[in-house]
């Protein structure tokens, strides 16, 4: 017999015969939710319900509605789609089919050029396969059998994947009817758990993301635990399409990106205003919270990157140039540079903590296929800071940072923030004592503030644990922006130290921290969160004054000067155009406040006020209108 324990919903234990299946354990220990369980965590490892459990351990259920459960049924859907495509187009060769956020895709090599016109037939075939409710069966195969099987099918992409599996590592396949795919799993017990699905788009994708390889056909889809959840997702995607920051910014003339500078932003005047407002806002917050702003070089010698470890682990993502037979790398991050400032003189423990911030321009050689507007770029500015401190100071610094972070998110209109703690990975540097203390120094501030957080087991970096802060936008999408990362390794590698109270050298802890992540991406998030109607304090034009006729142009100019003297960003449209046309143009440009000025308004030194999103016009004295305007543009 073996003993199985669980902490869900309360700590309980049960005895089972050796080699009991996950399905039997689920039925016995979680009878009320057994029908919705698609897999189990066994001692922290995810496995399907058919796999036997042969020793004492702990289990936790994975239900179909959970994030992990949804990931599993999307993996199921990817296999079902691959099977359907092959049944419709027998010459199809299969590449890879992973899950992605809210969906899945599969890469195909076939003679037929797939288009969205094929989706109906593929979806119909998928529905037929699901209706059969065949089981997903996991099998472990000897390497030779797997190679022969895929050779006989001519599946050269699978053979290439097999060739990269280390000798001695278990090779698993999943069978579904007569369909067999190379796969680690896990999968749900059978196809019926894929309750609702839809194919969404098709694109080209190079095999393994390498432009030297063949271009494959990638079909995307989404799958959900219910038709209602699918309908809600489709509605949100349609709403997201309307909010696409690339389209909105193009309409408003805020920025553009072109092929001659892939992944780098051409900021237009109004977009650059938004950028600078955000930068200056963060700068003021940093000063208030005790940070010192620095500026470091963009290119540094290869030797520094070798010392920091980035050359070994990050070189393929770095832009490298040669100068006088030296290799220089354009920096992909700021941290090694900040260490250089720290170690530029002897530091005392009395100086710590040192909070060093930079709006650092960084570059990363991201694959061209992954670039996406402002959300994924090659050239970007991090609102980056590094705190050099002692182990004893970490807790208070994390507490201070969280308070700053929440101030910022609230001002930008984000009230829903989730927190995740990524703790020690299996491969790590440092003693268990250091990791215990470090994890506690991240958890204690959250506990003290009553902040709920989830734990990403084993997902910390090898050099320290981290907290991640994720925003939820107005249509429910999540964006990971803020980070607190402890680092025991970099200061040691780069020779940073301070003189302690004992007169000896000590290595500081570095806290890597960011609030926005990158300014570019955060602006993209803001545009989509507000559908382009960003708050007045951020708007590049806060007030537009429209003249009804040329007779009031001088009065309108006086109004513009009055507003400008109060640091309002104002534009005057005194063109000889129809006033209705001017109003429509101001609405299209999403100007928060519009003052309309005609003979009547000029006669009594007033204005007619229109707010964006409201069709109503309010007549008031110019002085009162300005006071109301100043209140509006100062609100955060």
Swiss-Prot record:
InterPro entries: aa-tRNA-synt_IIb (IPR002314), aa-tRNA-synth_II (IPR006195), aa-tRNA-synth_II/BPL/LPL (IPR045864), Anticodon-bd (IPR004154), Anticodon-bd_dom_sf (IPR036621), Beta-grasp_dom_sf (IPR012675), TGS (IPR004095), TGS-like (IPR012676). It is found in: Cytoplasm. Homodimer. PANTHER family: THREONINE--TRNA LIGASE, CHLOROPLASTIC_MITOCHONDRIAL 2, THREONINE-TRNA LIGASE. It comes from the Bacteria. This is Threonine--tRNA ligase. Its EC number is 6.1.1.3. The gene is thrS. Zn(2+) binds at residues 335, 386, 512. Belongs to the class-II aminoacyl-tRNA synthetase family. One of its GO terms (cellular component) is cytoplasm. It catalyses: tRNA(Thr) + L-threonine + ATP = L-threonyl-tRNA(Thr) + AMP + diphosphate + H(+).
């Amino acid at each position: 017999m073996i003993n199985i324990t669980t902490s869900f919903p309360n700590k309980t234990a049960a005895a089972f015969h050796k080699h009991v299946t996950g399905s039997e354990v689920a039925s016995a220990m979680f009878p009320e939710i057994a029908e919705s369980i698609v897999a189990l965590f066994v001692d922290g490892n995810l496995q399907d319900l058919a796999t036997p459990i042969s020793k004492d351990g702990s289990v936790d259920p994975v239900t179909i509605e959970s994030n992990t459960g949804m990931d599993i049924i999307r993996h199921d859907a990817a296999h079902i789609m691959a099977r359907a495509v092959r049944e419709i187009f027998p010459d199809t060769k299969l590449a890879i089919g992973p899950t992605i956020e809210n969906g899945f895709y599969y890469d195909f090599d076939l003679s037929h050029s797939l288009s969205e016109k094929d989706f109906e037939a593929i979806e119909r075939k998928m529905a037929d396969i699901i209706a059969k409710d065949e089981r997903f069966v996991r099998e472990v195969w000897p390497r030779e059998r797997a190679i022969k099987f895929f050779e006989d099918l001519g599946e050269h992409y699978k053979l290439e994947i097999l060739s990269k599996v280390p000798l001695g590592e278990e090779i698993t396949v999943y069978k579904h009817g007569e369909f067999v795919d190379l796969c680690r799993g896990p999968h749900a017990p059978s196809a019926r758990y894929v309750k609702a699905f839809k194919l969404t788009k098709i694109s080209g994708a190079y095999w393994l993301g390498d432009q030297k390889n063949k271009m494959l056909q990638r079909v995307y889809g989404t799958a959900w635990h219910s038709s209602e959840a699918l309908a809600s997702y489709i509605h949100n995607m349609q709403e997201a399409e309307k909010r696409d920051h690339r389209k909105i910014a193009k309409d408003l003339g805020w920025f553009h990106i072109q092929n001659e500078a892939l992944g780098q932003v051409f900021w237009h005047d109004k977009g650059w205003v938004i950028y600078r407002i955000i930068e200056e806002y963060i700068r003021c917050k940093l000063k208030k919270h005790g940070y010192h702003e620095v500026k470091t070089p963009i290119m540094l010698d290869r030797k520094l990157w070798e010392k920091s470890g980035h050359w070994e682990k990050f070189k393929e993502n770095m832009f490298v140039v040669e100068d006088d037979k030296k290799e220089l790398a354009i920096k992909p991050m700021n941290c090694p540079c900040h260490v250089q400032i720290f170690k530029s003189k002897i530091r005392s423990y009395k100086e710590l903590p040192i909070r060093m911030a930079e709006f650092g321009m960084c570059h990363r050689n991201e694959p061209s296929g992954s670039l996406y507007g402002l959300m994924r770029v090659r050239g970007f500015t991090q609102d980056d800071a590094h705190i050099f401190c002692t182990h004893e100071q970490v807790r208070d610094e994390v507490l201070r940072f969280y308070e700053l972070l929440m101030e910022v998110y609230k001002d930008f209109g984000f009230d829903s923030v989730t927190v995740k703690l990524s703790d020690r990975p299996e491969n790590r540097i440092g003693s268990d004592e250091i990791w215990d203390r470090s994890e506690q120094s991240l958890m204690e501030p959250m506990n003290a503030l009553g902040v709920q957080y989830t734990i990403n087991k084993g997902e910390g970096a090898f050099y320290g644990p981290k907290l991640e802060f994720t925003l939820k936008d107005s249509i429910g999408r999540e964006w990971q922006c803020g980070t607190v990362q402890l680092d025991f390794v970099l200061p040691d590698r780069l020779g940073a130290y301070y003189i302690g109270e004992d007169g000896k050298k000590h290595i500081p802890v570095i806290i890597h921290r960011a609030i926005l992540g990158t300014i570019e991406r955060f602006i993209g998030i803001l545009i989509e969160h507000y559908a382009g109607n960003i708050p007045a304090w951020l708007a590049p034009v806060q007030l537009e004054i429209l003249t009804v006729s040329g007779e009031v142009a001088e009065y309108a100019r006086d109004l513009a000067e009055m507003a400008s003297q109060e640091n309002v960003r104002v534009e005057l449209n005194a063109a000889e155009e129809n006033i209705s046309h001017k109003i429509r143009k101001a609405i299209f440009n999403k100007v928060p406040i519009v003052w309309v000025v005609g003979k009547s308004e000029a006669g009594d030194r007033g204005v007619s006020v229109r707010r964006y999103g409201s069709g109503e016009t309010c007549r008031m004295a110019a002085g009162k209108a300005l006071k109301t305007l100043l209140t509006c543009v100062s609100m955060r």
